[in-house]
Amino acid sequence: MSTEAKCPFNHAAGSGTSNRDWWPHQLNLGILRQHSSLADPMDKGFNYAEEFKSLDLAAVKHDLAALMTVSQDWWPADFGHYGGLFIRMAWHAAGTYRTGDGRGGAGSGQQRFAPLNSWPDNVNLDKARRLLWPIKQKYGKKISWADLIVLTGNVALESMGFKTFGFGGGREDVWEPDQDVYWGSETTWLADKRYSGVRDLENPLAAVQMGLIYVNPEGPNGNPDPAKAAVDIRETFARMAMNDEETVALIAGGHTFGKTHGAGPASHVGPEPEAAGIEEQGLGWRSSFGSGKGSDAITSGLEVIWTSTPTKWSNNFFWNLFGYEWELTKSPAGAHQWKPNGDAGANSIPDPYDPSRRRGPTMLTTDLSLRVDPAYEKISRRFHENPDQFADAFARAWFKLTHRDMGPRSRYLGPEVPAEELIWQDPIPAVDHVLIDEQDVAALKGKILATGVPVSQLVSTAWASASTFRGSDKRGGANGARIRLAPQKDWEVNQPAVLAQVLETLEGIRNEFNSSQSGGKKVSLADLIVLAGCAGIEQAAKKGGHDVKVPFTPGRMDATQEQTDVESFSVMEPIADGFRNYLKGTYAVTAETLLVDKAQLLTLTVPEVTALVGGMRVLNANFGQTQHGVFTDRPETLTNDFFVNVLDMGTEWKPTADNKDLFEGYDRATGKLKWTGTRVDLIFGSNSELRAVAEVYGCADAKEKFVQDFVAAWNKVMNLDRFEAANR
């Protein structure tokens, strides 16, 4: 018998066929458990914001600036300057952001982990992060990898003569890959199963192929057609919240510096970091072409240098773009790229490693899109003729690119946060009045309940306001009271007619209260909306025999329509909200999957989701006042009836004939119809994990626990966006 056969540990714990292998369509609740304290190596009570505030940012930037021009033999710097490499690193960290669900981006240092660390578009960025290790090692916990990656991009630009718009710190690292981000369903790199129809890109994706940040630089699927490439550019950049001017500025600004790498065939390049041998120590793409580095480096397979000043800010990109007519050629690796007709400008570009050699300018297919596309060309020519406008546009677009997923300005830390307030930051006025106290809160609750507005409407309005929050990009939430503004006031899920009546009632209470105060005391509508929900829950709990006080912290303010970018908020309109039993249409994914997706964006745990759904149902807070899932004979009373009845074996459930998402529950003894429910309702009895939690709340001794857990989860959602309160 071999030694291997005798070993009792041929297969390690956690290996073998998984539940997901057996049941690939099983509801994935794991995304509600990611990034727990069990994965976090930092001490309990570690406060990254406080650590960053104690950081000598100027010293870090000084060290980064010095790093730029100290070329390392193990990965030499092009042109003696790492600026281009570090700009690409920061860009590709931030550029994964997409507006559809707010996921991706540079906010948590995900570029360190799979799959991003091994994407084809991120080839050799592992070297960039290794170059940064001595600086990360020096400053330790005072600066996260997430902040360091973005800051390094800024310093790279500044070290090459560009004036950046600013920098805000505060990106806290996570310690494992995100499990919630849908990067596509393709199983091979650079596949594009994500398209349907005539180039219709699947939502929420914002890249044309698996493993790319945005577009294929050779053109759609490698077709070197600048006009068709422009279509892809416009769509993908728009899904990252960039308009045409910002898009042109980013492409031209980024391609003012550095070069691409395609010294030889891709067949020489070894496996990516996640597939490389352990001896590679987390690095990948070892190349057997020549030295495998420097002038022999292979990254994208393209060998392009755009400008005559690749380590200095200039307007040379546009001079070259419009100064030559371009013809198609191929890189040494065989990739499509462009050179001037007749090899014009043959000696205008420096060689990255040999000062005695010169090259001609080269461009990517996607660069020529800025000249071929009529809208892009108009902007490009304006930037060409007005370098100051170009510099300002690039500075602003770069700042937006690298900060778009950070949420409101109140989260930005450090001395370089720009004073200017930008519309994409979803600005909210600072508190300018004395806040209401406990006595005022009690009086206002009484006035709200005295109006006779049903508990269900008070609760659903507060939920509609707060549940827009996305933990992904920290947008949305009750602060700002944007539920009263376009576009949210008109979203179908918010039942505009009912919403308008509730808001009118609350506005009357606010106006009466504010006009009767002295000393500058006021209540905002944003606060009053949340307080109304709290009052409704307290009344519903009291009806159920529970005297509970729902926590409330004032200090929210009301944003104006002018502070609200309608287009930017439109992408946040829910297609589903399982907490309100709302489903806008028919989708490829199940309603319960959309519930979990919504819950993850709300940073909820499995018990919190369970408590909230059960509570919202008995509070009668469904969209359209449907009775699906309202498993109680005493609606608007906060009880555990939902769980008691969804777990009741006296009910037999059957799908309805005309709706796969709707079910009818019949009394097993009498055959009479008792309840109707959706997939979101029945999943709490069907899914083994959710049923286990539902059983806790369905027990006879769990009535008080359920109320307390519901209130705690409710309070969490109401305050998810209160970053300004945390920083007071």
Curated annotation (Swiss-Prot):
List the keywords (alphabetical): Heme, Hydrogen peroxide, Iron, Metal-binding, Oxidoreductase, Peroxidase
**GO process terms (BP):** cellular response to hydrogen peroxide; hydrogen peroxide catabolic process
Q: Which cofactor is recorded for it?
A: heme b
Binding site residues for heme b:
H255
Site residues by UniProt (Transition state stabilizer): R88
Q: Which residue ranges run through the membrane? A: none
The record's free-text note on cofactor binding = Binds 1 heme b (iron(II)-protoporphyrin IX) group per dimer.
User: What do the Gene Ontology cellular component annotations say?
Assistant: cytosol
Write one Pfam family the protein is assigned to: peroxidase
The entry lists its GO molecular-function terms as: catalase activity; heme binding; metal ion binding
Question: Which residues carry out catalysis?
Answer: H92
Going by the entry's taxonomy, the superkingdom of the source organism is recorded as Bacteria
Listed under catalytic activity are: H2O2 + AH2 = A + 2 H2O; 2 H2O2 = O2 + 2 H2O
Q: Where do the record's region annotations for Disordered lie?
A: 338-362
Q: After translation, how is this protein modified? A: Formation of the three residue Trp-Tyr-Met cross-link is important for the catalase, but not the peroxidase activity of the enzyme.
Under Enzyme Commission nomenclature, its number is: 1.11.1.21
Q: What class of enzyme is it?
A: oxidoreductase
Location of the Tryptophyl-tyrosyl-methioninium (Tyr-Met) (with W-91) covalent cross-link?
A: Y214-M240
Which Gene3D superfamilies does the annotation name? 1.10.520.10, Peroxidase, domain 2
Q: Which family does it belong to?
A: Belongs to the peroxidase family. Peroxidase/catalase subfamily.
> Which PANTHER family did the record assign?
CATALASE-PEROXIDASE, HYDROPEROXIDASE I, BIFUNCTIONAL CATALASE-PEROXIDASE
- Subunit (UniProt): Homodimer or homotetramer.
What this chain does, per the entry, is described as:
Bifunctional enzyme with both catalase and broad-spectrum peroxidase activity.
- What name does this protein carry? Catalase-peroxidase 2
